[in-house]
């Protein structure tokens, strides 16, 4: 695929991004908009994998407590990601692009179990591959799962969709002096304890020499722009 800086991408979408203006769950017009952007990236020539979080339904680390152990809570969160992936799969197919949901937690009556080689075949055949269930293990975030799947699937970059247009020196919502990085290394992201992704995700990306492109999902066309190496982004790279 000549001319594309990232021929095979993994897009990480938070569960909260699917809420739109809703306080909980899914906002169908927002899901449809994100699906159209994924289809546009595919039409550009990129092979597209997607990891979706589950925070719009349940976040395991938040609900774990005295009466609910962390492992059980995390597995509940993984199931939430399956629901989100199925919704996004339907929206991608409604936008005219074949899609497949694959889950790290086997549930064959609902979707395919995740395995590396079948996932790569789906990508080569032009399908948008939605990766549900996180890593399949508790105590790992979907950000870490996204970097893991990107490394496994030989992706050229992780496109991390957030609510802000890149990585800042501090939270721009609370600190008016915060400035945005254009570029930063994995080592710097770890040393500065930046919260846009967890440390395990940055460390794994460093080990795999995998760039992470951070951008705002709220900006129309941002996924396609980031896939082309354009737009208002922060690049986290070796």
Swiss-Prot record:
Gene Ontology biological process terms from the UniProt entry: 'de novo' CTP biosynthetic process; UDP biosynthetic process
Binding residues annotated for ATP, in chain numbering: 12-15, 55, 59, 162-163, 168, 171
Catalysed transformations (reactions): UMP + ATP = UDP + ADP
GO function term, MF aspect, one: UMP kinase activity
UniProt keyword annotations, A-Z: ATP-binding, Cytoplasm, Kinase, Nucleotide-binding, Pyrimidine biosynthesis, Transferase
Binding site for UMP: 54, 74, 135-142
Compartment(s) of residence: Cytoplasm
Gene3D superfamilies, A to Z: Acetylglutamate kinase-like
Reported regulation of activity: Inhibited by UTP.
Pathway(s) served: Pyrimidine metabolism; CTP biosynthesis via de novo pathway; UDP from UMP (UMPK route): step 1/1
InterPro entries named among the record's database cross-references: AceGlu_kinase-like_sf (IPR036393), Asp/Glu/Uridylate_kinase (IPR001048), Uridylate_kinase (IPR011817), Uridylate_kinase_bac (IPR015963)
Job of this protein: Catalyzes the reversible phosphorylation of UMP to UDP.
Similarity annotation: Belongs to the UMP kinase family.
Name of the protein described by the UniProt record: Uridylate kinase
Species: Azorhizobium caulinodans (strain ATCC 43989 / DSM 5975 / JCM 20966 / LMG 6465 / NBRC 14845 / NCIMB 13405 / ORS 571)
Gene designation per UniProt: pyrH
């Amino acid at each position: 695929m000549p001319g594309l800086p990232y021929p095979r991408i993994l897009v990480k979408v938070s569960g909260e991004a699917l809420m739109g203006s809703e306080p909980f769950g899914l906002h169908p017009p927002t899901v449809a908009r994100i699906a159209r952007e994924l289809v546009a990236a595919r039409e550009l020539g990129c092979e597209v994998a997607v990891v979706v979080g589950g925070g719009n339904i349940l976040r395991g680390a938040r609900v774990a407590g005295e009466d609910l152990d962390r492992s059980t809570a995390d597995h509940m969160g993984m199931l939430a990601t399956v629901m989100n992936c199925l919704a996004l799969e339907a929206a991608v197919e409604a936008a005219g692009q074949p899609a497949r949901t694959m889950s790290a937690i086997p549930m064959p009556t609902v979707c395919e179990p995740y395995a590396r080689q079948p996932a790569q075949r789906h990508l080569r055949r032009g399908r948008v591959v939605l990766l549900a269930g996180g890593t399949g293990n508790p105590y790992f975030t979907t950000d870490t799962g996204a970097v893991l799947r990107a490394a496994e699937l030989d992706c050229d970059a992780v496109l991390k969709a957030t609510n802000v247009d890149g990585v800042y020196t501090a939270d721009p919502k609370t600190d008016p002096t915060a400035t945005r990085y254009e570029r930063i290394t994995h080592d710097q992201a770890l040393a500065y304890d930046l919260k846009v992704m967890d440390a395990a995700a940055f460390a794994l990306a460093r080990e795999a020499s995998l760039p992470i492109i951070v951008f705002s999902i709220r900006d129309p066309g941002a996924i396609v722009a980031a896939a082309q190496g354009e737009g208002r982004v922060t690049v986290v790279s070796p």
